[in-house]
A protein has these predicted regions:
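Interfacial loop at the N-terminal end of multi-pass membrane proteins
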Residues: 2-61, 67-73, 108-113, 117
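Internal alpha-helical transmembrane segments of multi-pass membrane proteins, especially GPCRs
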Residues: 10, 50-53, 82, 86, ...
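Hydrophobic alpha-helical membrane-insertion segments
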Residues: 14-17, 84-96
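Hydrophobic cores of alpha-helical transmembrane segments in multi-pass inner/ER membrane proteins
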Residues: 56-63, 126-138
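Structural signal for the C-terminal ends of transmembrane alpha-helices
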Residues: 65-72, 139-145
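Cytoplasmic juxtamembrane regions at transmembrane-helix boundaries
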Residues: 71-89
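Mid-bilayer segments of alpha-helical transmembrane spans in multi-pass integral membrane proteins
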Residues: 89-104, 128-131
Length: 145
Protein backbone atom coordinates (compact mmCIF):
# COMPACT_ATOMS: atom_id res chain seq x y z
CA UNK A 1 0.00 0.00 0.00
CA UNK A 2 1.39 3.46 -0.81
CA UNK A 3 2.89 5.43 2.08
CA UNK A 4 0.05 7.96 2.24
CA UNK A 5 -2.58 5.21 2.33
CA UNK A 6 -0.65 3.31 4.99
CA UNK A 7 -0.50 6.40 7.19
CA UNK A 8 -4.16 7.19 6.55
CA UNK A 9 -5.09 3.62 7.53
CA UNK A 10 -3.18 3.96 10.81
CA UNK A 11 -4.89 7.31 11.42
CA UNK A 12 -8.36 5.83 10.75
CA UNK A 13 -7.74 2.84 12.99
CA UNK A 14 -6.46 5.17 15.74
CA UNK A 15 -9.57 7.33 15.39
CA UNK A 16 -11.79 4.23 15.53
CA UNK A 17 -10.06 2.74 18.58
CA UNK A 18 -9.60 6.08 20.35
CA UNK A 19 -13.23 7.11 19.95
CA UNK A 20 -14.42 3.74 21.25
CA UNK A 21 -12.02 4.06 24.21
CA UNK A 22 -12.97 7.63 25.05
CA UNK A 23 -16.70 7.08 24.84
CA UNK A 24 -16.94 3.66 26.46
CA UNK A 25 -14.38 4.03 29.21
CA UNK A 26 -14.48 7.76 30.03
CA UNK A 27 -17.53 9.66 28.77
CA UNK A 28 -20.34 7.20 29.54
CA UNK A 29 -19.13 6.37 33.07
CA UNK A 30 -18.92 10.12 33.75
CA UNK A 31 -22.49 10.57 32.50
CA UNK A 32 -23.72 8.03 35.04
CA UNK A 33 -21.68 9.66 37.77
CA UNK A 34 -22.67 13.29 37.20
CA UNK A 35 -26.13 13.37 35.63
CA UNK A 36 -29.04 13.50 38.04
CA UNK A 37 -30.78 10.23 37.17
CA UNK A 38 -29.60 6.99 35.58
CA UNK A 39 -32.43 7.31 33.06
CA UNK A 40 -31.12 10.70 31.94
CA UNK A 41 -27.57 9.32 31.69
CA UNK A 42 -28.81 6.28 29.77
CA UNK A 43 -30.71 8.40 27.26
CA UNK A 44 -27.65 10.58 26.63
CA UNK A 45 -25.37 7.53 26.42
CA UNK A 46 -27.68 5.97 23.82
CA UNK A 47 -27.39 9.08 21.64
CA UNK A 48 -23.61 9.09 21.98
CA UNK A 49 -23.36 5.37 21.18
CA UNK A 50 -25.48 5.94 18.09
CA UNK A 51 -23.12 8.70 16.94
CA UNK A 52 -20.20 6.37 17.67
CA UNK A 53 -21.79 3.77 15.42
CA UNK A 54 -21.62 6.08 12.43
CA UNK A 55 -18.05 7.09 13.17
CA UNK A 56 -17.12 3.40 13.41
CA UNK A 57 -18.93 2.61 10.15
CA UNK A 58 -17.10 5.44 8.36
CA UNK A 59 -13.70 4.38 9.71
CA UNK A 60 -14.20 0.70 8.93
CA UNK A 61 -15.55 1.29 5.44
CA UNK A 62 -12.61 3.53 4.57
CA UNK A 63 -10.22 0.98 6.05
CA UNK A 64 -11.79 -1.76 3.93
CA UNK A 65 -11.31 0.35 0.82
CA UNK A 66 -7.65 0.88 1.69
CA UNK A 67 -7.04 -2.78 2.50
CA UNK A 68 -8.48 -4.24 -0.69
CA UNK A 69 -6.19 -6.50 -2.71
CA UNK A 70 -5.54 -3.94 -5.44
CA UNK A 71 -3.75 -1.72 -2.93
CA UNK A 72 -1.53 -4.46 -1.52
CA UNK A 73 1.79 -4.90 -3.31
CA UNK A 74 3.37 -8.14 -2.03
CA UNK A 75 2.02 -11.62 -1.29
CA UNK A 76 3.32 -11.49 2.28
CA UNK A 77 1.62 -8.18 2.97
CA UNK A 78 -1.47 -9.51 1.17
CA UNK A 79 -1.76 -12.25 3.82
CA UNK A 80 -1.33 -9.67 6.57
CA UNK A 81 -3.92 -7.43 4.89
CA UNK A 82 -6.41 -10.33 4.94
CA UNK A 83 -5.89 -10.78 8.67
CA UNK A 84 -6.34 -7.07 9.31
CA UNK A 85 -9.39 -7.00 7.03
CA UNK A 86 -10.95 -9.81 9.07
CA UNK A 87 -10.65 -7.74 12.28
CA UNK A 88 -12.15 -4.72 10.53
CA UNK A 89 -15.09 -6.75 9.19
CA UNK A 90 -15.79 -8.35 12.58
CA UNK A 91 -15.66 -4.91 14.23
CA UNK A 92 -18.03 -3.49 11.62
CA UNK A 93 -20.48 -6.37 12.08
CA UNK A 94 -20.44 -5.95 15.87
CA UNK A 95 -21.03 -2.22 15.45
CA UNK A 96 -24.08 -2.79 13.26
CA UNK A 97 -25.45 -5.59 15.45
CA UNK A 98 -25.28 -3.41 18.55
CA UNK A 99 -26.92 -0.42 16.85
CA UNK A 100 -29.68 -2.21 14.96
CA UNK A 101 -30.22 -5.30 17.11
CA UNK A 102 -29.22 -4.89 20.72
CA UNK A 103 -30.04 -1.19 21.11
CA UNK A 104 -33.62 -1.81 19.98
CA UNK A 105 -33.94 -4.67 22.46
CA UNK A 106 -32.65 -2.43 25.26
CA UNK A 107 -35.33 0.16 24.43
CA UNK A 108 -38.02 -2.57 24.32
CA UNK A 109 -36.83 -4.12 27.59
CA UNK A 110 -36.86 -0.74 29.32
CA UNK A 111 -40.38 0.04 28.05
CA UNK A 112 -41.92 -3.38 28.67
CA UNK A 113 -40.07 -4.45 31.79
CA UNK A 114 -38.12 -7.09 29.88
CA UNK A 115 -34.67 -8.39 30.65
CA UNK A 116 -32.74 -5.11 30.50
CA UNK A 117 -29.75 -6.60 32.29
CA UNK A 118 -29.32 -9.32 29.64
CA UNK A 119 -29.48 -6.94 26.69
CA UNK A 120 -27.29 -4.32 28.35
CA UNK A 121 -24.70 -6.98 29.20
CA UNK A 122 -24.76 -8.36 25.66
CA UNK A 123 -24.38 -4.85 24.23
CA UNK A 124 -21.47 -4.16 26.57
CA UNK A 125 -19.72 -7.38 25.53
CA UNK A 126 -20.23 -6.57 21.86
CA UNK A 127 -18.87 -3.05 22.43
CA UNK A 128 -15.82 -4.60 24.09
CA UNK A 129 -15.50 -6.84 21.03
CA UNK A 130 -15.51 -3.77 18.78
CA UNK A 131 -12.85 -2.17 20.94
CA UNK A 132 -10.66 -5.28 20.70
CA UNK A 133 -11.10 -5.45 16.91
CA UNK A 134 -10.19 -1.78 16.57
CA UNK A 135 -7.20 -2.21 18.88
CA UNK A 136 -5.90 -5.23 16.97
CA UNK A 137 -6.36 -3.36 13.70
CA UNK A 138 -4.41 -0.39 15.04
CA UNK A 139 -1.71 -2.65 16.48
CA UNK A 140 -1.21 -4.56 13.23
CA UNK A 141 -1.36 -1.51 10.97
CA UNK A 142 1.04 0.52 13.10
CA UNK A 143 3.59 -2.32 13.16
CA UNK A 144 3.60 -2.87 9.37
CA UNK A 145 6.76 -2.00 7.48
Amino acid sequence: MPAFQARAAVFLSALWWGSLSGLGFVVVPLLFKYLITPAEAGAMAAKLFSAQTWLSVACTMLLLLMLNRKNVEHAQSNDEARKITAWVVVGLLLTLLVEFGVAAQIVNARASGGNLRLWHGLGSLMYLGQWICAGLTLWRLSSRK
